Structures are given as C-alpha cells and as structure tokens.
From Swiss-Prot:
Keywords: Cell cycle, Cell division, Cell inner membrane, Cell membrane, Cell shape, Cell wall biogenesis/degradation, Glycosyltransferase, Membrane, Peptidoglycan synthesis, Transferase
One matching Pfam family: Glyco_transf_28
InterPro entries found in the cross-reference section: GlcNAc_MurG, Glyco_trans_28_C, GlycoTrans_28_N
EC number of the protein: 2.4.1.227
Gene3D superfamilies: Glycogen Phosphorylase B (3.40.50.2000)
Positions of UDP-N-acetyl-alpha-D-glucosamine binding: T13, G14, G15, N125, R167, S196, I251, A270, L271, T272, V273, T274, E275, Q296
Function, in words: Cell wall formation. Catalyzes the transfer of a GlcNAc subunit on undecaprenyl-pyrophosphoryl-MurNAc-pentapeptide (lipid intermediate I) to form undecaprenyl-pyrophosphoryl-MurNAc-(pentapeptide)GlcNAc (lipid intermediate II).
Protein's UniProt name: UDP-N-acetylglucosamine--N-acetylmuramyl-(pentapeptide) pyrophosphoryl-undecaprenol N-acetylglucosamine transferase
Protein topology in the membrane: Peripheral membrane protein
Length: 361
C-alpha cells in the first residue's frame, strides 16, 4: 500500500482542532501523510505547527451573525476557497478528505465532491453545525460524537456514532475510584475553567460564591489570557481566609489538572464535556448562552440526563446558587457523579475514527 495522503480540515476552536490532532497522530503511526487545511490567522496555526504536518491556509470566514456585508460576499469567497482546495487536493495527491469542523470545512467538502475524493466528516457537538449539516448530504461517511445529533433517517446508511477523539494524556488519567478517597476529609479541590479565553461570568461569580461557603475549598482557577489581574482582584476582595486559591491565565497540562480536581466548574464545549466523561470528574456546567443553536446546553445534557453532572444555566448563575451547589457536594457524592460520567465515555473513539478513515482509503 502506498503512503496515503489525508487532508484534515479543522479550524477556529480547540473543540475542532484537538480531536483532529488526536486522530492525525493515530493515522501517522499507521504510516499516513497528514496535510492540514486551516485559515491564515486561526488558532490551528500554533497547534499544528509542532507536528510538522504541511499546513495549507485558505481565506474563509464564518457567516452566521456577521451581517449582510459578509453574506453578500460569501458566494465569491466560497468559490475562491473551493478552487484553492481543489488545487491542494490535486497538487498533493490527496486520497481522502476528513472534516472536523470550522469555516474551512465547507469549501473543503465541496472540493472533495468536485474532485471525487472520499469525504468523511465528524461532528463533535450534540447539535450539528451548519457546515456539517450541509456536507452530510455529500459525505462518504458521517460520524457523530453523540446519538441523534443529525436526526436524519436519510443518513442512516452512512451515519455512525463514534464519540469524540481525545488525546492520550486524557485517556491515561486514573479512573475515579482510584482518585477519589471517600474517607479523605480535607478541602475539596475545585477546578474552574472558562476555556482558553476564560469566562468573565465565572471569574466574577466564583470568588463571591466561595465567600458564602462554610467548608474549605482548594481552588485552581483558569481565568483566560489578559484576565489574571482582574480575577485575582475579585478573589482578594472577598474574605476567603479558609480557602486556598490559585489564579492563572491558562492551564497547559489539563490531564494533570483533571487528575488533581474533585469538582470542575466550566463551560460545556464538546471537547470539555468529552474529556470530563473520559476522566470521570464531578462537574457543574455553565453553558455559553451565545453558542450557536445553544449547542453547549445540548452537550451538557448528555451527562446531566444521567445525573453525571449538574447543569447551571448562566441566567441562573448567582453567587448564592453556585455556593449552594458546591456546598451540597462531598467526596462520596463527587465519586458517584464521576463514575456515572466515566461509564458513558467512549475511550476508543480515536482508534475507532482512525479505523473508519483507514478502511475508506
């Protein structure tokens, strides 16, 4: 078998890029040559660069909520981007195109169709994005992380639920039963994560909630870049003498952070929800209310419906409410929640997706 050349499409957010990177690593081990399709200034540039994969940048932007001007320009932008991807496919002898989402997926998928190159798409969220809903009709294979994401019986013949691929470091974290000591009476360890950019509402609310709790917590708070001083000030303004807390702009080693924590308060992006499932950790989800189609709430419900997490909508998030949710948890309760989430995880998702791609070559 000649070396297969695979074009991975993932751009815009870590929720698209990290699963694609995990699968790319697995495919590289099997002898594939990975090419990456992204945008010139997207976060994928920095994430893909260390891998050494050839990076192909095209000009493409999002459409929803961007105004009439961008809408009018979209046909020309899409045509130009599609032609650029056709050149990439033909110029690099691409054998298969795999889309994990982001603005580049639409022109990439159309280019695959026009060049008669097999196309596989993967949807990470519980509600499919606009590009993937469109591309599903022309894809060779449609993969979804959660059941009923597409909800279209016409896709049944090519639709498969596979979970979300995550990095080996995450799947390597010890199981909940090995991490939670129900006889440990020390302070619960609280991890607060608002995504790579942070979440202002969490930065402001968590310190006030802790001030209302009578039992001690040890807190590690990722506040987002450029938010460290303001978040530190929010903690310093409260009487938190019984608590220990650390504020940092970004956590590089999330596997270690998950391993440390008893409870996490966070948004509900697909990657975050999947990692929490894989690790098995008690979670309070505060979905981003502005997320397209409210997909973060749908993501969170894949756990909360099984009592494997707590859903706290942002419009209900107050210091008092958050303090009540946190105060009601102890290690035995955290362990039960963590075990339920862990039981729902698909820890072979990366290998499963890689197998499907390999078989389609």
């Amino acid at each position: 078998m000649k070396t297969p050349h695979i074009l991975m499409m993932a751009a815009g957010t870590g929720g698209h890029v990290f699963p694609a990177l995990a699968v790319s690593e697995e495919l590289t081990k099997r002898g594939a040559m990975i090419h990456w399709l992204g945008t010139p200034n997207g976060m994928e540039n920095g994430l893909v660069a260390p891998t050494g994969y050839p990076f192909h940048a095209i000009e493409m932007q999002g459409l929803r909520g961007k105004g009439i001007g961008r809408l009018l320009k979209m046909p020309v932008t899409l045509l130009s981007a599609t032609m650029a991807v056709i050149k990439i496919i033909r110029g690099n002898n691409i054998d298969i195109v795999v889309g994990f989402g982001g603005y580049v997926s639409a022109p990439g998928g159309i280019a695959a169709r026009l060049t008669k190159t097999p196309l596989i798409i993967h949807e990470q969220n519980a509600i499919a994005g606009m590009s993937n809903r469109y591309l599903a009709k022309m894809a060779t294979k449609v993969l979804q992380a959660f059941e009923n994401t597409f909800g279209n019986s016409q896709l049944d013949a090519k639709l498969e639920t596979v979970g979300n691929p995550v990095r080996n470091a995450i799947t390597g974290v010890a199981e909940p039963i090995a991490r939670y000591d129900i006889n440990d009476c020390s302070a619960l360890k609280l991890l607060v994560v608002g995504g790579s950019l942070g979440a202002q509402v969490l930065n402001e609310t968590v310190p006030k909630a802790l001030a209302l709790i009578e039992s001690p917590f040890e807190v590690r708070h990722q506040c987002g870049r450029n938010n460290e001083a303001a978040t530190q000030a929010a903690y310093d303004e409260q009487d938190l003498s019984m608590h220990k807390f650390t504020v940092q702009p970004f956590i590089d080693d999330m596997a270690a952070a998950y391993n440390w924590a008893d409870i996490i308060v966070c948004r509900a992006g697909a990657l975050t929800v999947t990692e929490i499932q894989n690790v098995g950790i008690a979670a309070i989800f505060v979905p981003l209310p502005s997320a397209v189609d409210d997909h973060q709430t749908a993501n969170a419900r894949t756990l909360t419906l099984h009592k494997a997490a707590i859903l706290l909508p942002q419009n209900e998030l107050t210091p008092k409410r958050l303090s009540e949710e946190l105060a009601a948890l102890d290690r035995p309760a955290c362990l039960e929640m963590a075990k339920k989430g862990h039981a729902l995880a698909n820890r072979q998702a990366c290998q499963h997706v890689a197998n499907i791609i390999w078989q389609a070559l």
